[in-house]
Amino acid sequence: MKDIASDLNLSKMTISRVLRGQTDVSAATKARVLQRMKELNYRPNVAARNLRSGSTFTIGLIVPSLATPFFAEVAKGLVETLRTAGYGLLISSAEENSETEQFEVGFQLSRQVDALLIASVQESAEFFNDLARQKKPLIMIDRKPPLFSAHFVGVRDRDIGYVAAAHLIKKGCRRVAYLRGPRTAAADLRYSGYRAALNDFNVTFRPDLVVESSETSHLEYKRGADAMRRLLREKVRLDGVMCYSDLLAVGVIDAALEKNLNVPGDLAVVGCGNLLPVQHLRVPLSSVDLVGLEVGQRAARLALRLLSSEKVAPYQQLNLPPRIVIRQSSQSGAE
């Protein structure tokens, strides 16, 4: 550290602040220090640093599933931002199971993470109250638990449903089906956004156009295809389909093409996620982008602020707007 300070004509205190991830160092100075560290292959003594500071310089992240592309994007945004501040990321998966999540929370706390970020599968208020008593910075990611106040970073699921349905209606669709996801709060909120868009654009709600889909898994594609085949078999009239996920939407499109329907001429389709290689499909898929990378970046910056001496207003609510990426499956000149 002394050599780096001398080489850059900076004080050892400034170098130390960069290593600790403090925010009162200019971006230019931080970049110079990190570049010189790289050139010298400098590795700080983590154990000594942790003992001095009482910090592990590790942030914990618990997600419902590591198989979900959205959470991979969130983790990427976190890692990129935390790395520049000298922090690492410890990731755990709850596998969409509340008991597994409780185990992972205990594991992360036993590792003395400095802050905990969690996209929780829990519905118990007691669980969240126990978390709050740990006196560690806590940020909820993507999923906002009811009846519990905490910092939150994510996209409003209701907005996701609204944006997708509104796009199809603006394209001219009047009989818009909705393929629901699992019975979760997020799925219910997307459904409420779908209903709100129908109402705002004076489109009649038809219960027969709402199709339940069992829990998300590697079988999502099959569930989407099966649901579409059933709608066609029952001769349900529809001209647009909004899907809870991209995988469901891909299944819908393939089932429609089997019956020689034109997508988007006969049937417009929109998914949610924009994380699969949907632009390379037979019919490139329109999808609502959940901005996972930005969610991760914003959550990391909030965590660092909470860990610094900076004053942060209680229970920050960072609701990021979703955006729709329009491709061939719902191509429209209206947007």
Residues of each region from the PLM?
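Alpha-helical recognition/docking segments in bacterial nutrient-uptake
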Residues: 54-166, 170, 233, 237
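Hinge/beta->alpha junction and helix N-cap segments in small-molecule ligand-binding domains
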Residues: 46, 64-73, 91-100, 153-163, ...
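N-terminal helix-turn-helix DNA-binding module of bacterial transcription factors
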Residues: 1-57, 334-335
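Flexible loop/turn connectors
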Residues: 229-335
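Short acidic capping loops at alpha-helix termini that bridge into adjacent secondary structure
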Residues: 175, 205-209, 263-268
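Short beta-strand segments enriched in small/hydrophobic residues
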Residues: 7, 12-17, 52-67, 167, ...
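Short helix-capping segments at alpha-helix termini
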Residues: 84-85, 134, 198-205, 233-236, ...
